[in-house]
Swiss-Prot record:
Signal peptide: none annotated. It comes from Xenopus laevis (African clawed frog). This is Eukaryotic translation initiation factor 4E. It is found in: Cytoplasm; Nucleus. PROSITE patterns: IF4E. Transmembrane segments: none annotated.
């Protein structure tokens, strides 16, 4: 089906184009679309000769749709990262660590992937997670979202959305339900929310879930 050419409602611009030989660019073509929040993308590479903080590096900050895509299309996909690496996307001013003031009373909705899912699901899930964050997809509870992390690990990758207050049940459960739906997870798949305090003090290999959806 042939595209319909838009009508030129400004004959003056056509005359100007003829005289100068240059196309007149509409302001709409270069105006960027602002996001509600400014975001920071971090990269972690596990070098055992360095401290944890020294391994964490700020890549870039952005606050428009166009700058997000410019950054996303410039960096490696999560599935191509070396084992032991992380990407973290957090609101500007919040560092991707439990100790941050905005994180220390919070927790995370955790998605655990098996090895086969790295090829099929990891990049798709992570991009959808980023879309949920920058698009403020959790309605009035988006303010509770701090950021998200993807951990690339040999034994199985993980993706998590971090929230600021694990005791805020309404916000946490709403975020979890929306997130599960956005990822397209089947109803029979259960995802859990863990507080950072429980994760930091766990005695076994698993942390108890505060909430599940």
């Amino acid at each position: 089906m042939a595209a319909v050419e838009p009508e030129n409602t400004n004959p003056q611009s056509t005359e100007e184009e003829k005289e100068t030989g240059q196309e007149i660019v509409s302001p709409d073509q270069y105006i960027k679309h602002p996001l509600q929040n400014r975001w920071a993308l971090w990269f972690f590479k596990n070098d055992k000769s360095k401290t944890w903080q020294a391994n964490l590096r700020l890549i870039s900050k952005f606050d428009t749709v166009e700058d997000f895509w410019a950054l996303y299309n410039h960096i490696q996909l999560s599935s191509n990262l070396m084992s032991g690496c992380d990407y973290s996307l957090f609101k500007d001013g919040i560092e991707p660590m439990w100790e941050d003031e905005k994180n220390k009373r919070g927790g995370r909705w955790l998605i655990t992937l098996n090895k086969q899912q790295r090829r099929n699901d990891l990049d798709r899930f992570w991009l959808e997670t980023l879309m949920c964050l920058i698009g403020e997809s959790f309605d009035e509870h988006s303010d509770d979202v701090c950021g998200a992390v993807v951990n690339v690990r040999a034994k199985g990758d993980k993706i998590a959305i971090w929230t600021t207050e694990f005791e805020n049940k309404d916000a946490v459960t709403h975020i979890g339900r929306v997130y599960k739906e956005r990822l397209g997870l089947p109803a029979k798949v259960v995802i859990g929310y863990q507080s950072h305090a429980d994760t930091a003090t766990k005695s076994g290999s698993t942390t108890k879930n505060r909430f599940v959806v």
